[in-house]
Amino acid sequence: MAISLGNAFIKNFLGKAPDWYKITIISFLIINPFVFFLVDPFVAGWLLVVEFIFTLAMALKCYPLQPGGLLAIEAVAIGMTSPAQVKHELVANIEVLLLLIFMVAGIYFMKQLLLYIFTKILIGIRSKVLLSLSFCLMAAFLSAFLDALTVIAVVISVTVGFYSIYHKVASGQDPSTSHDHTTDTHVREVSRDDLENYRSFLRSLLMHAGIGTALGGVMTMVGEPQNLIIADQAGWLFGEFIIRMSPVTVPVFMCGLLTCTLVEKFQICGYGTLLPENVRRILVDYDDEERKNRTNIDYAKLTAQALIAVWLIVGLAMHLAAVGLIGLTVIIFATSFTGVTEEHALGKAFEEALPFTALLAVFFSIVAVIIDQHLFTPIISWVLTLNGNAQMTMFYIANGLLSMVSDNVFVGTVYINEVKAALVNGVITRDQFDMLAVAINTGTNLPSVATPNGQAAFLFVLTSALAPLIRLSYGRMVYMALPYTIVLALVGLAGIEFMLLPMTEWFYDMGWLVHNTSEVMSTIAPAAGH
């Protein structure tokens, strides 16, 4: 039976999203103008924020760009904010957009080196505890200098590759032949137990790597997009950012590694599964074959990528240019010295990051509404009436709770804008601002590991082709993240409460930090002029 034109429009709207979700989004779009014009713009603004958080929380039903974008377009259309204000937010955060566009694409052309490193780690270390720590440490180190999304993309590529190699053999086929590894129809009965254990083994490594991106990502200004936003508003460079965060991030890092060891040793929350010996033998044989087939051309590419990695770290550490521009140099160097010159091949590098970049532009549209409607002003004003550590603690908790259900880039951007406005208006001192910026950064990065909604890298894992292969569902991901969530959130809170102020004072006394003056303050004042 032919479908009517009206039903066709409904079916096409938001694609494969459930009908109840489509109806909900349409309801939001109908209700918002009435609330804005007939009730109160302030209430309408908060309603929009809740609706947008809902689209982020339901990211597995529909990617948030479309429903969130429709809400943002309507908000501009009815006057909740203006196109000029949205543009202002985008221009103010151009470095973040450049990071996502160029840095992620740049690392795409270094995947060969990263795949090589992770492969050697996976095969070379037999102890599961040491292997888990290695994956966590490697992901943390890489995320301190690269975008976490990129690091996870590499880990996913490695994991899919190794999964498919064994799946072929378990299905009675040669590893070099083409094979559909998404179905277990041809898996031999004797191999099924090994396959299930292998899935569990890969799940645990993937989660350790994911947590590693959070542990390393919180430490530096380039580890997460919101870090760059916060550093930009505070006028901090690469080294100062690391030092200011260290009273919280170093204890969290150590406790995170301890948690990694304990969950593996005591097999807590789905961890502790060993790599089956049959699987190891197949993987080692495959790696030996790959090594034999590797030519000088391949080794030349690996050498070039290693040298580019050194340039990347030096460029970031010395702040030689905006992070995104350093990413652009990586693209140019990597493609020049590995022979990638076709436009089509270049285009593939941008596929991973551009959807999230577009979503970030929508974030900033919602932030523009929050600023124009003064939505967070009452909350910020109340918190700023608190004394001493209570201010930092409340900011950490508020950021942490919201980051568990919403994207931490969105949360961090909102709070740092409000605190910046308080600084420019003379409500708080520059030293207070620096302390609150640390609380906001750690609050958005650490508790957000609780759910895939908070961390873009986690959501990327859950929506990837790998998740169904290794049976990694939303619920299982939350369950496996639970030990880390508890430890990271509580140790971070303790760091804010007991260590941040005394350690920062010690850094001042040692001359590692200097009290920022009005000269630094003036660098952030223009961005706050709304």
Curated annotation (Swiss-Prot):
InterPro entries: Na+/H+_antiporter_NhaB
Transmembrane spans: 13-33, 34-54, 64-84, 90-110, 113-133, 136-156, 205-225, 234-254, 306-326, 351-371, 378-400, 450-470, 481-501
Membrane topology: Multi-pass membrane protein
Coiled coil regions in record: none
Gene Ontology CC, one term: plasma membrane
Domain of life where this protein originates: Bacteria
Reaction(s) the record says it catalyses: 2 Na(+)(in) + 3 H(+)(out) = 2 Na(+)(out) + 3 H(+)(in)
Primary localisation category: membrane
Disulfide bonds: none
UniProt keywords, alphabetically: Antiport, Cell inner membrane, Cell membrane, Ion transport, Membrane, Sodium, Sodium transport, Transmembrane, Transmembrane helix, Transport
Location(s), subcellular: Cell inner membrane
Alphabetized GO MF terms: sodium:proton antiporter activity
Pfam family for this entry, one: NhaB
Family per record: Belongs to the NhaB Na(+)/H(+) (TC 2.A.34) antiporter family.
Job of this protein: Na(+)/H(+) antiporter that extrudes sodium in exchange for external protons.
Name assigned to this protein: Na(+)/H(+) antiporter NhaB
Organism ancestry: Bacteria, Pseudomonadati, Pseudomonadota, Gammaproteobacteria, Vibrionales
